[in-house]
Amino acid sequence: MNIVSWKDANDEVAGGATTRREREVKEDQEETEVRATSGKTVIKKQPTSISSSSSSWMKSKDPRIVRVSRAFGGKDRHSKVCTLRGLRDRRVRLSVPTAIQLYDLQERLGVDQPSKAVDWLLDAAKEEIDELPPLPISPENFSIFNHHQSFLNLGQRPGQDPTQLGFKINGCVQKSTTTSREENDREKGENDVVYTNNHHVGSYGTYHNLEHHHHHHQHLSLQADYHSHQLHSLVPFPSQILVCPMTTSPTTTTIQSLFPSSSSAGSGTMETLDPRQMVSHFQMPLMGNSSSSSSQNISTLYSLLHGSSSNNGGRDIDNRMSSVQFNRTNSTTTANMSRHLGSERCTSRGSDHHM
C-alpha cells in the first residue's frame, strides 16, 4: 500500500471540505444580514485611517495658526500663534471664578463665542492698555513677526469695537453698525495701500529714481503725441489739395485749400510753420508728374510762402493762408492765358512745319 498517495488524497479531500465549510459560513452570514436589514442590501465600508484631529487640521485655513509637531512639544488638539514672544498656545486655561465670569459676560453680551467677550473687554480697557509700556522686540523673534505681520491684518485690530463687527448686544444691533463697519473697511484699505507702496519703494533714492523715470517716460510720451499730432495737422490730404489736369503749361495749378480747416478752428494758438517743411509735404501729390513740372510747382509754392512769411514776419498763420489762397477770377485768368499761349505755340509750330 502506498502511503504517500493515500496522504495526498486525504489532503485534497480535507482541503475541499474546508473550502465548502467556508462557503457555508459566508452564506449563513449573508442570510443573517439580509434578514436583519429586512431584505435590503447593506454595503459595509472599511473604517478610514484618518483621525478626527487630522481632519480638523485640514479644515483650518487661517494662515496665522501654526501647527507644531509632537517632536517639538506640540499636541494634536493644540495650535499656536506667532507673537512678539514667540509661539503661544491659542487655548488658555482659566481659573474657576474667571471662567464663570467670562461665560456670564458672554451671555449678557449675547455673543456666541467666549473670544468675542474677551474682545469686548480689551476694547473697554483700551485706554489703560495704551498707557502700558510697549513690549521690546527681540532680534530672534523679529524675523518671525515680520514674516507673519501681513497675516495679522486679517484679524481684528486692537482698538476695534466688537459692536462694529455686527455683534448682538442684549439681543439688538445698533443702527451705526453698518456705517462704522464700512469706515473700518475703508481705513483698512488705505492702510494696505500705504503699506504696499512703502514695501515696494524701499528707500528714498529708489523712490526718487522711479519718480524721475516716470516723469521722463511721461514727457517722452507727451512729446511723441505732440509730434504725431503736428505731422497729422501738416500733412495735407488729397481731398484738401486739388490739382488741375495739365493741359499745355505745367505751371497752371489751382490750389483750393492748403491747410485743414479743423486745425485752425480746433487749436487756439498755432505755432509758425517752416515753408521748407510745407514744400516737402506738398511734394507728395505731385510725384506723379514729371520732374520739371514738379520742380516748377514747388518753386512757385515756395516763392508764395516765402513772400508771405517775409511780409508778415511769420506771426499769424491766417495771413499766410489768405496769401496762399487763390481767387476764382485769378485762376480763370491764368487758365485763359495758358490756353492762349498754347494756341500761339501751336500756330507757330504749324508755320515752321510748312516752311
Curated annotation (Swiss-Prot):
Q: Which Pfam families match?
A: TCP
- Tissue spec: Expressed in cotyledons, particularly in the vascular region, in leaves, buds, flowers and immature siliques, and, to a lower extent, in roots.
Annotated GO CC locations: chloroplast; nucleus
Q: Which gene encodes it?
A: TCP13
Task: State the protein's name.
Answer: Transcription factor TCP13
Q: Where is the TCP domain?
A: 74-132
Gene source species: Arabidopsis thaliana
List, in alphabetical order, the Gene Ontology terms for molecular function in this entry.
DNA binding; DNA-binding transcription factor activity
Q: Sorted alphabetically, which keywords does the UniProt record give?
A: Chloroplast, Developmental protein, DNA-binding, Nucleus, Plastid, Transcription, Transcription regulation
